[in-house]
């Protein structure tokens, strides 16, 4: 058995003494005095910041929202079932932040940026604060590039630009999510990173959206942030900020991003629940006084950056649900006043089979034609006015027994215009095909057809144009202008298709 000599013991002790590092750590510790309904009240956290992360003894995390004289109100980021009265709470000294990286593309995550798709961990070397200040005035430039949605009604009459905030508003089951997801599908090959944030949705609905993205190949450039209806209110409140932080990461790396918030009504309800449990004074519709700031600080993060910052952009499409078409409720009016326009979806139009059920008359884009290519402006300039006049005339025609020939022709043209705006779900159209479609409708080529024949004729014409006149697409995509040459090619294709179509109908 080996024995240690005195000099060896002396040497070992000296080495240990030299290695000794006297480190004094100060931790901000408190005690739980009350816990329940996703809220904990803590005493003893004297030097905590508003919004600081705290950690409970059993591992649950929370955010300090109420800083009162005698206690601190914490919202829990979990169920908190194992937290006991009297247990210790430690302040972390950090504000809520998430890891960010390119590895998040194609993944489904929760509000804490943890993967929930069962495909393993996500490796990230950088992190971003969940809540960061919006770009200032000097950091921005005006919106001038179009963000094509693939939906004729939007791209022609309510255009959206890169860096814009456009609200999608309507009753439940009117196709709000379908408009948003179709916009994501249309970004394929456009070098746009998409973030879809599902707040308080049914798990089956989110699964359906994710399946559609996989089937259409959209998951390659999309991140899905999902907090279902059974998630704690804190996580539903945080989910949009997590999505915004991920989109900002790409925006500041000179990329174009699109973020969908589906929907902000649910986030406001989660925030109302948290605020009432924290005993904050309720205001209109029992929402807290700062619910406007909740949404304004989120939506102001969408921007088109200037050339010094790389000209990246973040386009936001928030969704808000209305009750029986009441857009004068608190949350709808708040978000309408923050955004750069709104797309109204009508339950009446949806039930009448007009889908997407966009009410073009009261929908508006405050960026307007600045976010359209010149070719679209040339062709679709008067289409919104024509549709508005048609809607007015149609309402009048219900009560008038006899109409003059001009009014009858205007009604017939309006019905065909409305028919060409119909599109099936997950079927976005490239801008060249949209221009051809609108040209046919506004120039009266559909007037000779029955309304039931319009869809079939347009489908066949688009295929015929692509197969026999590929130069048309090349001219529009390269020059962004509806040139005389493009018009001649389109007219030839229309005449050929009209002849073929009349022969088909005769046989």
From Swiss-Prot:
Subcellular location: Plastid, Chloroplast thylakoid membrane
Entry binding sites for ATP: 170-177
Keywords: ATP synthesis, ATP-binding, CF(1), Chloroplast, Hydrogen ion transport, Ion transport, Membrane, Nucleotide-binding, Plastid, Thylakoid, Translocase, Transport
Catalysis performed (reactions): ATP + H2O + 4 H(+)(in) = ADP + phosphate + 5 H(+)(out)
Function in brief: Produces ATP from ADP in the presence of a proton gradient across the membrane. The alpha chain is a regulatory subunit.
Assembly notes: F-type ATPases have 2 components, CF(1) - the catalytic core - and CF(0) - the membrane proton channel. CF(1) has five subunits: alpha(3), beta(3), gamma(1), delta(1), epsilon(1). CF(0) has four main subunits: a, b, b' and c.
The protein's name: ATP synthase subunit alpha, chloroplastic
